[in-house]
């Protein structure tokens, strides 16, 4: 097998990277007739598998689960997840041959082996679904010619797919049909129906390609979505302790602060996030953000370059063969940090205090969102896709940190995302530590003192914030998010 993306010529690569179009609401119907009455079998019952299945069942679809023989015999966590929620569970041999749509939601590292087995049992002219295109794009696995291959990629961890659905909303999703496997020209309608069934029509469904999804997804999760949040949590916490802040308060300010601050981003972009600051704080955050962008630009671009070239995938797959040795080392290292082990702060922190005492956190978010977006765009990825991967998914990741800190985030994201996040944060932490030497009173841990304002400076800062391309595309895309529900902070 070989990297599918690297086998294409330059023109084909560009066409695939640039494929991303928001589907108008008038073409999305909750009736979902295409998959009604069909046998849908989900392979794997982890975070994505369970939560997508719950949403699909609640949308009136017939869902069952295929698990390995040993998973059923040993009654492992996947078996518990499925059976405790009332789903029928069977072996590959027993239920895959009955399926009209087989959705493979096992971890990326298992895809090659799992898909080889699935193809032996799938009936002629059936459909194979993925929620991440890594195996197709980076591994280059070939699928039987009669099988239609589709993808629905929710832009968040599986837990948030369910939570947003229960709120009556949903999470954005990219849908795609593998151009090498659509023999009956039915892939698009089936993928669209699947996306509707998990609630994504409430937030936005984008018609994309396997390649655009993989390259943008890897970039987003490695940098701003997971890697930057991880590195910033650890460094900001240590900085607060250095400043003499109560450790448990510092822990809560960081742990819950990301969720509170990014909730404003979800509803009104970077503009609203900075509007939550005083004018003095906004100007300070703006200029801190400019410095951070300059510092982090080479690292963000390196990650994008390694994703495009396949270098990242090659190195990660080598670690797979090495029994995840590097992944496990990084995982243990993060779990043993002071931030992860600090005591819980039980007092309520007022919402505005997170903004007032987290000015640096606001600056970090602004810098990371804009950098991730800008570098995706210069690589050929469309603005719509770059927006979801650098901004909209951010509060959904922050929600996981708010629950059980970085442990929860790393638990619910994929192993691929976790590996990439550790890779980025390992390089980002020294840069952030050095940047802490530039902090002034009011940047982190306490409120900045109000100072005399220059009207012209404030006007120019506001104009710069509002005119950034991610703010322009964000206003357009948020018009489709008609049922967005605010999250209440505890």
From Swiss-Prot:
The record's Gene Ontology biological-process terms are:
isoleucine biosynthetic process; L-valine biosynthetic process
Where on this chain does Mg(2+) 1 bind? 217, 221
Cofactor or coenzyme needed? Mg(2+)
Binding residues for Mg(2+) 2, per the UniProt record? 217, 389, 393
Question: Which residues constitute the catalytic centre?
Answer: 132
What residues does substrate bind to? 414
Residue positions annotated to bind NADP(+) are 45-48, 68, 78, 108-110, 158
**What terms describe the molecular function in GO for this protein?**
ketol-acid reductoisomerase activity; magnesium ion binding
Q: How is the cofactor bound?
A: Binds 2 magnesium ions per subunit.
Residue ranges of domain KARI C-terminal knotted in the record: 209-344, 345-484
Question: Which Gene3D superfamilies does the entry link to?
Answer: N-(1-d-carboxylethyl)-l-norvaline Dehydrogenase, domain 2, NAD(P)-binding Rossmann-like Domain
Q: Report the PANTHER family cross-referenced here.
A: KETOL-ACID REDUCTOISOMERASE, MITOCHONDRIAL (PTHR21371:SF1)
HAMAP family, per the entry: IlvC
Return the protein name: Ketol-acid reductoisomerase (NADP(+))
Origin organism of this chain? Buchnera aphidicola subsp. Melaphis rhois
